[in-house]
Amino acid sequence: MPANLSSALETFKQQRDAAEAHYLKANRVSVFFREYTAAVETLLAALWAEYFQNSALCLMAVGGFGRGELYPCSDVDLAVVSPAPLSDGIQEQIARFVQTLWDCKLMPSVKSGSVDELCESVRNDITGDTAFLEARFLFGNRQTVDKLAEKMNAQRNVAAFVEAKLVEMEHRHAKSQGSGAVLEPNIKSCPGGLRDIHTLLWIAKAQGLATDLPDLLKQRILTRAEAGMLSHGYRRLAHIRIHLHLNAKRAEDRLLFDLQPQVAESMGYEGLNLRRQSEELMRVFYRAIKTVKQLGGILTPMLQSRVSSTPLRVTLRIDDDYIQVNNQIAARHTDIFFRRPEHIFKIVEIMQQRNDITALEPQTLRAWWGATRKINRSFYQNPENRRRFAGFFRNGNGLTQTLRFLNLYGVLGRYLPAWEKIIGLLQHDLFHIYPVDDHILTVVRNVRRLALDMHSHELPYASALMQSFEKQDILYLAAFFHDIAKGRGGDHAIQGIADARQFAADHFLTGEESDLLAWLVENHLLMSAVAQKEDIQDPSVLDAFCKRVQTHERLSALYLLTISDIRGTNPKLWNAWRASLLESLFHAAGRYLTGNGGNPHTLFGRRRQEAADLLTRAAVPEKQQKKLWNALGSAYFARHQSREILWHAANLVHDFETPIVRSRILPKSDSFQVMVFMPNGPRLFARLCRIFSRHGFDILAARAFITEHDYILDTFIVQIPSQHAPEDYPDIQSALEAELNSFIHGHTVAETQSRSRRISRRSRYMPIAPSITITPEEDYPDWYSVEITAVNRPFLLADMAEVFFAHNVSLRYAKISTLDERAEDSFTVFSPDLKNPKIQSSLKQTLLEQLS
């Protein structure tokens, strides 16, 4: 590199470092952009003089560089423009210029060509056209730049450009779905992100409007309040993106888990632990993108309407205050929301009741939103407003859209102060992926979908149950309030009771409705916990559950709410296995509440008789049956459900001395049920778990049983890895059975190291503290319940089984609840030694070492 360029590069580095240092001290986005852009332009001036002095070419800044919004590690978007087609020599010179930019550690993105070539290249390229929309002259022949701008503006179809940018935004938003996009959002491309702000400004500029907020204010595109809010939201997002680049030291626009604490700390969230810093950062982020989405709802249709060819304007009278304009509702006088605040809810009520109205007309929305900021205690105390708000739930029609609309524009938080506290609140528990307010509204949506025929195919049984449920509005309210007390510290289910009861009293619910609502809020985790963590074949478990539930109405409501809650927490959580657990508990509890539960001895006898009837029909002699029952022992019928007993009996009755493996694909699921029968021996359960983990199976449930003649009869439910299609299941089943058969006949299977597969980035940087509780079983000496919560990982169950074995603890039952990256496992174990506090403490400590 020539000496003069080396000097220019050194000057650039000094100016860049000074811009970053000044920013970190003064924290002003606009100053950083100005200083860093100037540093890059100074370097470009030296390079241009070196390569293109006195040439007919010109250099333009385009894209983000063109608008003066250059982030620390962003591409430097440039265009080299020639009045005539480029010769081979000029193209080689441009290539050397670009290579020097790379050598200077910039990230150049360079277009080159003649005026005609560049115009043609963007004719059908919306991205390229957008980049040139923000072009500005840097060096060279200015007349060439003017000619290019004139020609591009002349060929641009403004209406088509606007429509294409809006379609592009829709596609961008559609890609920002799923847990990764929610938990580690792309600050540039997510809904409400920086690219949405750019899109608004591009649409304005294409129409010949200004692209800076003060000028848009003068042109009456924005109100003063909107300009202030958009500017504030933009600065928030720009601050985060600058810090993100500085901490990542690369062009990283995703708020990755490992970067969230670093960004939060560098932005000044001090005095908090890493998790709280990250949560506070993400809460600021979610509120910023919410502001952008709010303004987009007003400005996008307003700007679009200026250029789009719309259908014939059809205006219909609704009442003295409102008219319908095509599919929108408009106020005759937009000051009505200030003069008569009860209309803040009335217009929403009309929109909810009318399927032919899908939105508020932009000017009406602007006025309505302005008035909502005046919602206060007096507004809440107005009985008319309370009736209308409760009516949103009683009506049900369009409930999800109504609540999301009210949440987007801040009405829910102003009307209900408890709601304000959960807006944008993240939960780093390794299974929730949405902020609390979004999660709640997703659960409301799920409950509402169960009530609609059009969605009955998703969950036919639950849908039929919901459609016959009399108090649907109370279920909607239970979904709305179930997590409203999150983030306060303590048990949110208990704390939410007071919020639910206060709402019920203020909104004219009957005492019976209030009781059901409060009970559902308090117990919304009950059914999920029992179904996923406890042995519902144990009559004492069912008895305790039903004593809490007491009525069929509560049971049905809790079942529907639980399904909707799990499905609204994380798409990965809902599967056929979890559905079958809840349905089994629901039906078992229903029989119990009807009086058909029977006492334990009757239940066990019925299970044995059902199996005996099956074997008799298969012509198995009664003498042979008795031998099997004696080998299994009476405890067997207390620990297994009827379907398992029938399956085991059919496979074991003719020979219960020879080891066998059997498996079956569970109907309508991606899971196998596997039984392993073989002579008892050391570490068998742990070694079996390792085989499943090595094949990539998730163990959903496991039951370890030792027969009277010292054989193990272990039954597993394992989930097939998601990358496999159903047509692959038989081959997977055969391969698994082959390895298990080899194992039970004494052939050594290679042991696999427990930590051979890495845990996720989320688990590494946002871990949960492992917890262990050991509780003696009532009425069963030497039996204990062990509850473990930890980060999920491969071989976790096998490792815990090894610890149990090392401490002379016999594992008899395991219920595995895998909540995405969080494991909540329940074990029933037998050990006379655990009466000794030292041994119990040693077991806990060793388990914690495995889990940490």
Swiss-Prot record:
PROSITE patterns: ACT, HD. It comes from the Bacteria. InterPro entries: ACT-like_dom_sf, ACT_dom, HD/PDEase_dom, HD_domain, NT_sf, PII_UdlTrfase/GS_AdlTrfase, UTase/UR. It catalyses: [protein-PII]-L-tyrosine + UTP = [protein-PII]-uridylyl-L-tyrosine + diphosphate; [protein-PII]-uridylyl-L-tyrosine + H2O = [protein-PII]-L-tyrosine + UMP + H(+). One of its GO terms (biological process) is regulation of nitrogen utilization. Uridylyltransferase (UTase) activity is inhibited by glutamine, while glutamine activates uridylyl-removing (UR) activity. Residues 319-672 are annotated as: Uridylyl-removing. Residues 436-558 form the HD domain. Its EC number is 2.7.7.59, 3.1.4.-. CDD domains: ACT_ACR-UUR-like_2, ACT_UUR-like_1, HDc, NT_GlnE_GlnD_like. Keywords: Hydrolase, Magnesium, Multifunctional enzyme, Nucleotidyltransferase, Repeat, Transferase. The keyword Transcription regulation does not apply. Its cofactor is Mg(2+). Residues 673-757, 785-852 form the ACT domain. Modifies, by uridylylation and deuridylylation, the PII regulatory proteins (GlnB and homologs), in response to the nitrogen status of the cell that GlnD senses through the glutamine level. Under low glutamine levels, catalyzes the conversion of the PII proteins and UTP to PII-UMP and PPi, while under higher glutamine levels, GlnD hydrolyzes PII-UMP to PII and UMP (deuridylylation). Thus, controls uridylylation state and activity of the PII proteins, and plays an important role in the regulation of nitrogen assimilation and metabolism. Has four distinct domains: an N-terminal nucleotidyltransferase (NT) domain responsible for UTase activity, a central HD domain that encodes UR activity, and two C-terminal ACT domains that seem to have a role in glutamine sensing. This is Bifunctional uridylyltransferase/uridylyl-removing enzyme. It comes from Neisseria meningitidis serogroup B (strain ATCC BAA-335 / MC58).
